[in-house]
C-alpha cells in the first residue's frame, strides 16, 4: 500500500467526546495510530480545538506515543492567512461526524489493512482491561 496522508479528528475519534475536557482514549486508537505511522502514513491532527485546548490535545497524544506530522494544517508550521481555506488535503479523513459515524479503530485498521491484524506488540502494550476501561 502506498503511503497515505490521513487527517484524524480528536474529540469523538481519538478520544471519547468530552469537549472541552479530554475524554478517555477510544479503544485501540493509539495502537492503531502508532501502527499507521509505522506503515509510513502521514498523520495530521484535524480538529476544531484551538489555543490552549488544542495544545492540551496535542500533548495528550504525545504522552500516548503519537506525534502528528502537522496540526490543523497540511504541513508543520504552515502559515495560514484568513483568506486561506482551512480544509486539509488528505487521502483519508477519520472523523466521528462522517456519514455512518465512526466505525471504531479496529474497523479503520481492517479497512486499510484487510489482511493484517494490529501488530502484536501494540496489542500487548496494554492489558485487555486497561484497553477496555482505561
Identify the meaning behind each predicted range:
Residues 1-134:
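HAD-like aspartate-dependent phosphatase fold
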Amino acid at each position: 500500500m502506498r503511503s497515505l496522508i490521513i487527517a484524524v479528528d480528536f474529540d469523538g475519534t481519538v478520544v471519547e467526546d468530552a469537549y472541552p475536557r479530554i475524554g478517555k482514549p477510544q479503544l485501540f486508537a493509539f495502537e492503531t495510530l502508532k501502527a499507521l505511522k509505522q506503515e509510513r502514513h502521514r498523520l495530521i491532527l484535524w480538529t476544531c480545538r484551538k489555543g490552549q485546548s488544542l495544545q492540551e490535545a496535542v500533548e495528550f497524544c504525545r504522552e500516548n506515543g503519537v506525534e502528528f506530522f502537522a496540526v490543523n494544517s497540511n504541513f508543520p508550521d504552515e502559515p495560514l492567512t484568513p483568506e486561506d481555506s482551512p480544509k486539509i488535503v488528505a487521502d483519508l479523513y477519520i472523523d466521528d461526524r462522517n456519514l455512518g459515524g465512526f466505525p471504531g479503530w479496529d474497523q479503520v485498521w481492517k479497512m486499510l489493512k484487510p489482511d493484517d491484524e494490529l501488530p502484536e506488540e501494540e496489542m500487548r502494550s496494554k492489558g485487555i482491561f486497561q484497553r477496555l476501561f482505561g
